[in-house]
Amino acid sequence: MHRTRPTFRSTVATLAAFATVVGGLVALTPAAQASAPTAAPAAARASTPLPPALEEIRAAEATRLYGDPAERPLDQRKTGLVSLGDSQISGEGVGTYEPGTDGPDNWCHRSPDSAIHRTGIAADVTYNVSCSGASTVNVRVGGTAQYADELVQSDSLAVKARNTKIKMVLLVAGANDDLQFGPVMTDCVVRWFTLQGPCADKYRAGWQARVDGLVPKVESTVADLRGVMRDAGYADGDYKLVVMGYPGPLAPDFRDNPHFPGKIPGGCTVSDEDTAWARDGAVPAFQSGMRKAANNAGAVYLDNSRLFHGHEVCTDDDWVRGLYVDITNPFPPSANSVRQSFHPNAAGHLAFASCLTQLYDSGLREASCADPASTGRPALQPGGWDDAFQPLKNAGTGSCVDVSASKTRNGSKVTGYGCGDGRNQGWWYDTGTGAGARSLHSELSHDRCLDVPSGTYRAGAALSLWDCHGGENQKFVREAGTIRPASAGTLCLTLASERDPLRLQNCDGSANQRFV
């Protein structure tokens, strides 16, 4: 449940099912009710007493940490980080799990390689009290413990907060509430195996209502965790309370992987249509709901919705475990045999850890994280991704730069089209200094950039989408309304007519070469 480390050490409910095994997926005294906000210095405030059962646990943990059961002043404690929530942060999918959390009576699947143990945030002790399958009711004050040997997660926080000086509380929860992401994913996988067709049309119409239903539950959970920390003697500014959003495990471009082994060997066992809906509809809507909940509750928000773009199941550098069936645990197989499927693997948790480290050090209240140039090194950006992408409207034609039919395979066409609000017309220009600097990313995928094919800089050359790689043929300069290849400054992006392909032409100062 916890890991001790040197002070300066650097360092989803199951989301899928196997059709022949699974028809569905998984599910002491409360510490306190939420108390009023306070700005008083934590050192000047005493904690409220815990109920006897929790105090006994606290005293035993203090003895293991310090050699005696006393509750110490904050400035005399070890520093700590703690994560709460569900399978997305517990370590489900990593494959290595702490004793007692890998069945048969407890399937929390906490991994020693989960993100909270791998950040570069200076801390003496790291705690992972999250549990695969958790919903907000398993986290909130007065909630329900998932297993007989588990505490409600807010009670675990109450104990840790009295024994260590908590620097960051990380919450990742919501997927197992109204959204029911696991059962939906199960259905999509089963439908693919049994040739029933895509599941997207079944869920698309009601998806936003599901998101709307989970938002107040996440908000209330954040408020409860604030109350737990106040009752433990902390002022709100003494630590960071971070709500982390969920990345998507699937994308429709997996066949661009030169080593694509096939859907069953690779584990991306859903229809192509469903991978597109997951990336372009389901995950973005979920992210917007999580962002709203975090902002309404006053938590720091980390938007990871694009973090796994280019690293989804069946890609050539995946950060997610695909469909996986453990035929040995349990035996005979059951729903628990596939619970590791479609969850972040060890590389995914390392990416989480990198983003969390950058966020902690940044001081930002809201930030987004992604891998902008397929380097495997996530980069943090201020603000939410929802605000970063903008249309490129041509001053001459009045149309917008459009990814044709929202298809993002390598070589996909980029044209003009009547302006709308679709993600196929959103673009983000990377103004940073990293490997992806000066690239133009499609809102559909952070791993698809505007590209001059083969670096052929000539008048009339049509542009397309390609894997983002940070090469010169994906770098552009914005100058006086024009967009020019960084390596060919006399050529400008041009829309000759409303629906013409986006081409390079000699810069001539015309409105057809200006974008607003």
Predicted regions and their residues:
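Alpha-helical cap/lid subdomain in secreted, periplasmic
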Residues: A158-T328
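Histidine-centered active-site loop/cap adjacent to the catalytic His
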Residues: D326-S374
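Serine-esterase "nucleophile elbow" of acetyl-processing enzymes
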Residues: A60-S132, V189-V190
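Low-complexity, acidic Ser/Thr/Pro-rich repeat tracts that form intrinsically disordered stalk/linker regions
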Residues: A31-T79
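Structural recognition of the beta-strand scaffold that forms the well-ordered cores
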Residues: G80-E92, T126-S130, K167-V172, D177-L179, ...
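Short, well-structured alpha-helical segments in soluble
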Residues: G142-T164
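Extracellular glycan-recognition/adhesion modules and their associated mucin-like linkers
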Residues: A379-R409, G426-Y457, N473-R499, V516
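Secretory targeting and sorting signals
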Residues: M1-A39
